[in-house]
Structure formats: C-alpha cells, structure tokens
Amino acid sequence: FIKNDVQKATFLKKGYDGDNRKFNLSQDITCKLYRSFSKAQMKMSISQLEKFRACPFSHFIRYGLRPKTLETYDIEKRELGSFIHDGIEAFGRYVQENYATLESLSEEALRTFLQTVLEDGAKTRFEHHRLSSPRNQFFLKRSKENLYDLMLGIIEQMKASRFRQVGQEVHFGQRGSLPPIYLQLGEDVIALEGFIDRIDKATFGENSAVIVIDYKTGKKEIDLSKLLDGLDLQLMLYLMAASQNQDEAAGAFYLHLSDELLEVDFREKEKILQAFKKTLLFDGLVINKPEILKAIDVNYDEKNPTVLRFYGRKKDVIEKDNVLSTDKLTYLLDHAKHRAIENLEAMYQGDIKIYPYQTNKDNACTFCTYKAICAFEPNTSEAYRLVEPIDWASLDKMVG
C-alpha cells in the first residue's frame, strides 16, 4: 500500500505520528479564559481544582472553552442523582426548622412532606414535556420511593447520634455564612469557595466539634491515595472551612444516596434491611477520641454500627485505618491546602496538557465528556499520570 499510493500513505503516517502535545497558554490568555483569575473575581471552587488535577486538558475544555452540551429528552442518571440530592437537602432543612426532637416526626408527616417537596422539585428541575414521558415517570417514581427509604435510614442515624445538624448547603465564601479559604498565588490571593451539603455539631462542656457530610449519588469512597495526590480535596477542605470558628475538626464523610437496586443473595427481610443500612454508613475519616466517636454513633463499638463505617482488620475501633489521631487529621488538612495551591499555580501557568490520572481502580477518561476532543491514545507516545496506591500504614511515616 505504501509503495502503490505514497500520498495516502504519507497522510496516514502523519495521523499516526501526530504530536498531540499541548503547550502552556500565555498568562494573558489564561487570565482571560478562566474567570477565576479575573481581578473582579479572584475566587475558585474545589471541584475546579479537582478537575484540573484529574486532567489539565479536560479542565481547560470545561472551564476555559466552556462548550455547551446537547440536552436530551430522557432524564439521565446524573439528573436523577441531583434530584435525590435536592430531596435529601430539603428533608434536612425541614427537620432542622420544624422538629426539636426526631421522635415527634411521624411517618405520615414524612410521606406528606416527601410528596409535596418532590412534586415541586420535579417541576422545577425538569421541563413539562420530559415529565410526561412514561420512561421518565417510571424512574422518577422509583427515585421518590427510594428517597423515602433513604430518609428513614438517615432519621435512624440522627437518633443514634448526639451531633445535630446546624447547616444544610452551607456556603463558605466572600458572601457566605462561613469565610472562604484563602490561597496565596504570587502577590495575589484566591478565595476558595463552595457549598457544604451538611454540617453537624456537638458540644462537650465548653468546647464544640463539627463534622461535615458530603452527599454522593455515585460510587465514591474514601481513598487515601487520591486524598494525598490532590484528586479528592473536597472532604478535607470542607472540614477546614467548617472548623474555622474555633470548633474542633472531628470528621469528614461521604453519605451515599444510591438510586441503584441492592443486590443480595438472601431473601430474609431483616437481612435485606441490614444490608441497605450498611450502604448508608458514613464513609470517611474521624478523629480517634472515644467521646466524639460515641457522640457521632452511640453504637460505634458494636458489631453493627449505626452511623460510621470503619476500615482495617484491627478489632479495636480506635485503631481502625480511618480513625485518625489529631496529628494525622491535621496533616491531611494541611496537605489538602498545599495540594490546592500546587494545582492553582499550575493552572495559572497555563498548563493544558493531556495528562489524565490513572490508579489501580480507575482513570480520568472513564466518564470524561471530552474524549472525542482530546483523542488521547495511551498506547502511543502519550501516557497516563500514574497515581500509586498508598496504604494507611504509610501515613504513620509521613506524620512521623
């Protein structure tokens, strides 16, 4: 073929040998592209920093070029996740504003609230023509039923905890109820802003402690490798923001709000209920103080805790992998801020290279919307940015 049609062969060879490298943008273009660096704003979200760390080029498309996505008629899984997220937040506000004790909240009142808030929420979030689709109606109905079970599970958690909600969708930022986290960028200062899904607080004599809960509708679990790499900054920086008012930083957790069917290999109702409750356990990091552990989860040291999920083989809860000393938790908080500054500086220098991360579990390309744009080919001269697995024992050496 190469001998018979040199012109076509040359064309194909150029495509195969093409250079897909992306060089840094000038600082002038960077500041014009990213609104965060304009003198009028000088603020940024944590999710933007995480996106940059996952892949600079994907971040450049999302936040620099900002392409519009085509709307679809079918309600997508991502939208259903947001719908469930909104329902749980509305439920949290409803409980916080109307019930001093959860014992006075009846199942009838919960169902009435659920019916009203979800009907209003569906009308607000989805256009009328999408709500009329039988397919969409089915998935919305299933989500509503699932939300009721989620709320019952969360109520049981609240009853087993002395920590009480003090905020839903709490804004930390220049105009928020909490101040922003300030990051130094050369001679400038960037305000890191965001919204914390939920903050719970408890008092211990003259002192108080806070925990933050981040609602997740996808499969998200605590991962030390990603925490240290800077891929997962939210939990640590949310906790830093929430504890700025002299409250002790006691824990940061994901709360999974899955709309997926529960797969079990047994039929007993009680076992199915226990399996469902396990999906709702707080997944994150907590300080190793027994009085705080007991305040978060009265059953923390039992075989089946009500609120907290623990990692590691050691029998003593205090020695579990994700139960950390004050020094370790402080180290992770400081490290998250350090990583945020690193990401910010690289972004400011105009880094837009195609360099997606890869761990032993996943990579940045799996759910990336912009794969067709970058044409990343890991089998050629291009390569993933490898994130090595780090076990919890390594944290001891880092802290010293």
Regions found by a protein language model. Name each.
Residues F1-G400:
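Structural signature of nuclease core domains in nucleic-acid processing machines
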